[in-house]
Amino acid sequence: MRAKIYHFLVNRKPGIRQRYHRFHDGTTGMKKVVSWFYLLWLNFCYYVLFCRFLGEQTEFPVYEEKKPPCAESESVLANRDRRSVSETVSFLMQYEVISFDIFDTLIFRPFSEPTDLFFFLGEKLEILDFKRLRMQAEAEARTQKYKEEKHYEIKLSDIWSRLQNEIGVIKEQGMQMEQALEMEFCYANPFMQQVFTQLREHGKRIVITSDMYLSKAFLSELLQKNGYEGYEELYVSCEYEKSKADGSLYEVVKRAYPDTDSMIHVGDNPVSDVKNAKKHGFEVFYYPNVNRNALLYRSYDMSAVVGGAYRGIVNNKLYNGTEQLPMEYEYGYIYGGLFVLGYCNFIHTYAREHGIDKLLFLSRDGDILRQAYAVLFPEEKTEYVYWSRAAATKLMAR
């Protein structure tokens, strides 16, 4: 019910949504209450006083203009000068111990921002503005940890100890739901999965090093689910109260291997995974974050949930380094699929509402639509019909 009210008052008009979040986000106490009255006032002005300008976003146009590369595909431009899987394996083979980062290196989330997962958790909990509350609780937990122990490394339980007082959800229940979503959404990076597997087949010594509030036990299960097994140790910042962010976790890894200085770390963060690793005696292999070009090429004039998933899925595909795809394929993957999915869903809904028991897809443009429709709704009757465009033009002209 709360989600429906939120959608009704906030999401129907882009301008109202923008103005409300600009005022509401980051507020606490009485100002948060005032923001709710502000939301009601915006709706009153728009629908009762006919202040239609409030429905339009300010500063940013409703539809963005992006200029993706036209001469070559994005994946070709991004991956042409990068090492292939086999070249990466050959390079890493010269080191005795190989350390891997987890998120955005071994494991992908289908989002352009990792915190987008909190949208889905908030929907399950039926809590408005949960993403902000979750991020705020994490920031406050880190601040409190530093005040008490002079470091920022926290566990998921520290975050939910704060959240349960804020939102009224039992800590253990919230933690379980959040971890279940991580397990559901996370998947293996196809590039690094091949690299990892080949290194294991060659008998290389592998460790995994991550700055994370999720427990070692949970991350072990997540890695196993996605095909990462056979590593020697998993170093997680919240377990050791040391981090890559300040370099102290690298010292923990080095102490575990006192007989070698032939160590390399693989990761996507220029500071934590590159600068700090070098500073603490590791060689480094920088794996560029797949979402680094999200602002340049991907659209942001979409809903937060759909837009985050769209950008993440597309960027994970194009920038992981596995393939150099032709422009035609990328055009379909980035743009065409969205339109086809939306149109097929529209046809399905229309047919169901009007009792239509068989759908005819007309040649030639209908061929791809019918193939997609058959995948989405295999139980429905469809037929591909040869049809003259000239006949269609004459029919519509009458």
What are these regions (language model features)?
Residues 381-398:
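Long, charge-dense
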Residues 89-135:
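Active-site neighborhood of HAD-like aspartate-dependent phosphohydrolases
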Residues 99, 207, 211, 356-363:
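Short glycine-rich phosphate-binding loop at a beta-alpha junction
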Residues 149-208:
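Short, acidic loop-to-helix structural element flanking the phosphoryl-transfer center
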Residues 269-284:
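Acidic, divalent-metal-coordinating active-site segment for phosphoryl/phosphodiester hydrolysis
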Residues 1-100, 328-331, 335-355, 365-369:
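Non-catalytic pre-domain segments flanking phosphatase-related domains
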Residues 245-271:
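Conserved Lys-Pro-Asp/Glu-containing loop-to-beta segment of HAD-superfamily phosphomonoesterases
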Residues 200-207, 212-238, 376-378:
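Substrate-recognition/cap helix-loop segment adjacent to the acidic, metal-dependent catalytic center
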